[in-house]
Amino acid sequence: MEEVTTCSFNSPLFRQEDDRGITYRIPALLYIPPTHTFLAFAEKRSTRRDEDALHLVLRRGLRIGQLVQWGPLKPLMEATLPGHRTMNPCPVWEQKSGCVFLFFICVRGHVTERQQIVSGRNAARLCFIYSQDAGCSWSEVRDLTEEVIGSELKHWATFAVGPGHGIQLQSGRLVIPAYTYYIPSWFFCFQLPCKTRPHSLMIYSDDLGVTWHHGRLIRPMVTVECEVAEVTGRAGHPVLYCSARTPNRCRAEALSTDHGEGFQRLALSRQLCEPPHGCQGSVVSFRPLEIPHRCQDSSSKDAPTIQQSSPGSSLRLEEEAGTPSESWLLYSHPTSRKQRVDLGIYLNQTPLEAACWSRPWILHCGPCGYSDLAALEEEGLFGCLFECGTKQECEQIAFRLFTHREILSHLQGDCTSPGRNPSQFKSN
């Protein structure tokens, strides 16, 4: 059945069929400019549990002005391996060829993430399929596990990509965010892993998706699911910004000057809270159509403390710091420190400075979870695909289209004003 999303209204795309049965989780969103097409991905599960994931599903949306007309739900059976469940959709669009790569993991049977971490025995495979017609048809699955991870797999208790979107950098590099539970050592007498900790990293390709590699782990902080966005300061240097989930009640942020091979300035952002155990969040960069006054409070007491830095890249980052950015960041995430509720949209007008996030504009009041953003820069539009409900966050995955002006009108340029109440920004 076709549905239409109008600007500024939430439109459910995937609905839970029963509170103990078929459930859709883990949204990923991609926009393809030449065809004005949204691709909305999700996991179909037999229950809400991770180990009961089945396969990925897709709905294609055609944008007509500020309307999106959605086609029917399509199961992506191409994105499967025999005896495995498919999880964590992570799409990226390659502009030169027009090819869409859909990354995901395939996990053996019903083996849980916890079982893999405790035993140190990985049950996940790194895979992708691709489409050359904006998601109408898809290739056969390709397993990249040996090519990308190879002998290092013995140190990866388990791993995953995304979830959410990947990006293509100005250099042409394709970047897929990922994380692994890394095993630094083993108790040989018991054949059990020792001090296993999760760290984010990037998987990338410099030849339009023909071959793939992985970058260095983001250390020393524990980081899990992440997304990245490329920002450009006035000095003209592109910098890759990473936003990662942590269990530390605050979001982790890091910067890369080598296109994602390594990250520096890993820090906790006190302005971006995490609920207990954390939650996935989404980030996109964009060039603003209009520029109000910029954030002034870069010396806030909430400015993050630098945990790690690289001398070789410090000079470039220092050159960019303190200058207005050509790129802004938009970030989506639950806004409560206590539970996954009230999905917020945050704006950062100076991404290379500390503590310059706005107060959130509440896009959905009530239970919420994972989300994914897409920026339509030339049109001044944004899309958000997010988990939400009235009693539980897994009741549906909804889509919202909103404008650049709408963001500014709700946030009113606020960055750090302590007297502002997030309830002022709630949207019906």
Curated annotation (Swiss-Prot):
Q: What top-level branch of life does the organism fall under?
A: Eukaryota
Offer an example of a GO molecular function term for this protein.
Answer: alpha-sialidase activity
Task: Report the source organism.
Answer: Homo sapiens
Q: Where is this region: Disordered?
A: 294-318
Entry function: Exo-alpha-sialidase that catalyzes the hydrolytic cleavage of the terminal sialic acid (N-acetylneuraminic acid, Neu5Ac) of a glycan moiety in the catabolism of glycolipids, glycoproteins and oligosacharides. Displays high catalytic efficiency for gangliosides including alpha-(2->3)-sialylated GD1a and GM3 and alpha-(2->8)-sialylated GD3. Plays a role in the regulation of transmembrane signaling through the modulation of ganglioside content of the lipid bilayer and by direct interaction with signaling receptors, such as EGFR.
The subcellular localization recorded is: Cell membrane; Membrane, Caveola; Early endosome membrane; Recycling endosome membrane
Which residues, by range, are in coiled-coil regions? none
Question: Thermal profile, per the record?
Answer: Optimum temperature is 20 degrees Celsius.
> Per the UniProt entry, what are the Gene Ontology biological process annotations, in alphabetical order?
carbohydrate metabolic process; ganglioside catabolic process; glycosphingolipid catabolic process; negative regulation of clathrin-dependent endocytosis; oligosaccharide catabolic process; positive regulation of epidermal growth factor receptor signaling pathway
For this record, an example GO cellular component is:
lysosomal membrane
Q: In which tissues is it expressed?
A: Highly expressed in skeletal muscle, testis, adrenal gland and thymus, followed by pancreas, liver, heart and thymus. Weakly expressed in kidney, placenta, brain and lung.
**Quick one: effect of changing residue 51 to D?**
Decreases enzyme activity
Under Enzyme Commission nomenclature, its number is 3.2.1.18
Per UniProt, subunit arrangement is:
Interacts with CAV1; this interaction enhances NEU3 sialidase activity within caveola. Interacts with EGFR; this interaction mediates desialylation of EGFR and enhances downstream signaling.
Name the family the entry cites.
Belongs to the glycosyl hydrolase 33 family.
The protein here is known as: Sialidase-3
Residues recorded as bearing Phosphoserine in the entry = 313
* Residue positions of motif FRIP motif: 24-27
What keywords were assigned to this record? Carbohydrate metabolism, Cell membrane, Endosome, Glycosidase, Hydrolase, Lipid degradation, Lipid metabolism, Lipoprotein, Lysosome, Membrane, Phosphoprotein, Repeat
Q: Where is the composition biased (Polar residues)?
A: 301-313
Q: Which residues bind substrate?
A: 25, 45, 179, 181, 225, 245, 340
What are the leading ranks of the lineage? Eukaryota, Metazoa, Chordata, Craniata, Vertebrata
Q: What does the entry's PTM section describe?
A: Palmitoylated; may regulate intracellular trafficking and anchorage to plasma membrane and endomembranes.
Q: In what way does activity depend on pH?
A: Optimum pH is 4.5-6.5.
BNR repeat ranges are 129-140, 203-214, 254-265
Q: Which InterPro entries match?
A: Sialidase, Sialidase_fam, Sialidase_sf
This protein's encoding gene: NEU3
What's its membrane topology?
Peripheral membrane protein
